[in-house]
Amino acid sequence: MLNYLWFFLAALFEIFGCYAFWLWLRQGKSALWVIPALISLTLFALLLTRVEAAYAGRAYAAYGGIYIVASIAWLGLVERVRPLGTDWLGLAFCVIGATIILLGPRWSAA
């Protein structure tokens, strides 16, 4: 159950870290945004290692669905952009795929 917490926190730190670079490089904000970006992306990587999974690739694949959910939420809540129907449809497919991976029997080393 803690896996979901680690995934959620990792997603927040990854999105914020990437968004900080976006602000600097795409919106002309101060280069000082690199500092919180690097801290946030480091925390993202550390948190993702807390997931109880035998293989990194499987953990990252399952995390991808949660990241996409968090990204669409970020789009609406932080950037104040209403997600399109295609955003919701793509999100649904990704969540289904991530759920299949999460519920699979091979989360521990065989």
Swiss-Prot record:
Keyword Ubl conjugation: no
Keywords: Cell inner membrane, Cell membrane, Membrane, Transmembrane, Transmembrane helix
Any Pfam family hit: UPF0060
Source superkingdom: Bacteria
Topology class, membrane: Multi-pass membrane protein
Cell inner membrane is among the record's keywords: yes
Principal location listed in the UniProt entry: membrane
Ranges that cross the membrane: 5-25, 28-48, 59-79, 84-104
Compartmental location: Cell inner membrane
Any single Gene Ontology cellular-component annotation: plasma membrane
InterPro entries: UPF0060
Secretion signal span: none
Family: Belongs to the UPF0060 family.
Stated name of the protein: UPF0060 membrane protein PSPPH_1503
